[in-house]
Amino acid sequence: MAAVSLRLGDLVWGKLGRYPPWPGKIVNPPKDLKKPRGKKCFFVKFFGTEDHAWIKVEQLKPYHAHKEEMIKINKGKRFQQAVDAVEEFLRRAKGKDQTSSHSSADDKNRRNSSEERSRPISGDEKRKLSLSEGKVKKNMGEGKKRVPSGSSERGSKSPLKRAQEQSPRKRGRPPKDEKDLSIPESSTVKGMMAGPMATFKWQPNVSEPVKDADPHFHHFLLSQTEKPAVCYQAITKKLKICEEETGSTSIQAADSTAVNGSVTPTDKKIGFLGLGLMGSGIVSNLLKMGHTVTVWNRTAEKCDLFIQEGARLGRTPAEVVSTCDITFACVSDPKAAKDLVLGPSGVLQGIRPGKCYVDMSTVDADTVTELAQVIVSRGGRFLEAPVSGNQQLSNDGMLVILAAGDRGLYEDCSSCFQAMGKTSFFLGEVGNAAKMMLIVNMVQGSFMATIAEGLTLAQVTGQSQQTLLDILNQGQLASIFLDQKCQNILQGNFKPDFYLKYIQKDLRLAIALGDAVNHPTPMAAAANEVYKRAKALDQSDNDMSAVYRAYIH
């Protein structure tokens, strides 16, 4: 591949890892962000996603030269929105250039005039100038009366413009904050960098740490610069992260990837077991993105809708696994997860060398480790991938996926994770994702109980619950979760988006996780008791927000 000449401000197509090429712009990195060692790379901000990353030069292509090619390959909605953002950026930049063309012409005229004044004047010209001198002085006097002070040529320029003219940059020398890039700024891009879309340019506040600029951006950068070296060996060794060169086995930063752009479906056959609240949305998105999917559910009627959408029907879990390359499973609890694998006509009976199994259930680390061992012992490959989200996020394909286990299988699931989620995290050895998922749900469940407690306390003290919600929505606690759950309570709508019985199960497992390492979890324990009371009030199959009823009965 021929070398491509790129400069700061150039529009490019950037290829990041396993994701499709995405439109972006080469920008200056934050001053305290070190450039990765090794091959030459540029810092790129992607349109439509707010993601940033160092991209190797061989993974970059000029935007205009490859535009038609990329548009033919990718057809997704988010990809098209990103392309539209680029075109809007170009339109506004062009309009800015046209607006400034007149001032550029004036500058040129002034330079020409200056050159005329600086050349030697002949005798004839001196006589002509002396004859017209009186008229010139008169006109200048009239001009002073008409033109307000401050509108002179010097006064019409901004302080920044004057500073730039007084301190011109030496040719070929990049500004101080561009030294890491070692590239000159393209003259054709200067207008774009100052145009109406200036918000697209990376502009860190020097008085604030970079991580405050974009929470996801900070984690994304960590994932690009601090990835631990990982490898896998057979059976149990295959499921462990190898020690880094320093000898430390701790994971400094999870390997995460922002899922964006259109999805190019894998040619592998996909199986899916379990069509509950979460599984149904996941399968629907897999089918929409063009995957070949075989489904199974304990109650076969739930499969009918997906058969109409193009899915195939599997009669047993073993049949699905044996006929598919990668099989996902999403069931309710540890017992259901074990029964699915170890029971009659279960997953284990269909496992052969090379078959892949991905468990998306929220279970404890011991359960998922046991499942991994039996799958790998049959020559299969295993990945745990519980998801953070609810029914609506599942339907929208906006789940957060926490994966651990076989790194190669994680890569093979790329298009599937793109279809079902907005972000995926790789957390290392089997059991890490289960632990992280329980901690996430422990925080969520405890917060939900606190919300319910606050609303009931407001009610019994004569305060408006709606006003409390309005105040919370204007403060630091404001979130979609807070607003939706409070609205559910105020409207008395407890249609399940996340079953109360499942959040209580996760709290119980999180408390057990704390007990196993002798770590106190008093807040989770208190919340768990409230959920147990709500279950006793027959709220198990309602949404988790129904914990509110435990406080009013």
Swiss-Prot record:
Residues 214-217 are annotated as: Interaction with histone H3. Residues 92-190 are annotated as: Disordered. Residues 92-145, 162-182 have a biased composition (Basic and acidic residues). Residues 8-66 form the PWWP domain. One of its GO terms (cellular component) is nucleosome. It is found in: Nucleus; Chromosome. CDD domains: PWWP_GLYR1 (cd05836). Keywords: Chromosome, DNA-binding, Isopeptide bond, Nucleus, Phosphoprotein, Ubl conjugation. The modification Phosphoserine is found at residues 130, 167, 540. Pfam families: NAD_binding_11 (PF14833), NAD_binding_2 (PF03446), PWWP (PF00855). GO terms for molecular function: chromatin-protein adaptor activity; DNA binding; histone binding; NAD binding; NADP binding; nucleosome binding. Belongs to the HIBADH-related family. NP60 subfamily. Cytokine-like nuclear factor with chromatin gene reader activity involved in chromatin modification and regulation of gene expression. Acts as a nucleosome-destabilizing factor that is recruited to genes during transcriptional activation. Recognizes and binds histone H3 without a preference for specific epigenetic markers and also binds DNA. Interacts with KDM1B and promotes its histone demethylase activity by facilitating the capture of H3 tails, they form a multifunctional enzyme complex that modifies transcribed chromatin and facilitates Pol II transcription through nucleosomes. Homotetramere. Interacts with MAPK14. Interacts with KDM1B at nucleosomes; this interaction stimulates H3K4me1 and H3K4me2 demethylation. Binds to mononucleosomes. Interacts with GATA4; the interaction is required for a synergistic activation of GATA4 target genes transcription. PANTHER family: CYTOKINE-LIKE NUCLEAR FACTOR N-PAC, OXIDOREDUCTASE GLYR1-RELATED. The A.T hook DNA-binding domain is required for the interaction with MAPK14. This is Cytokine-like nuclear factor N-PAC. It comes from Bos taurus.
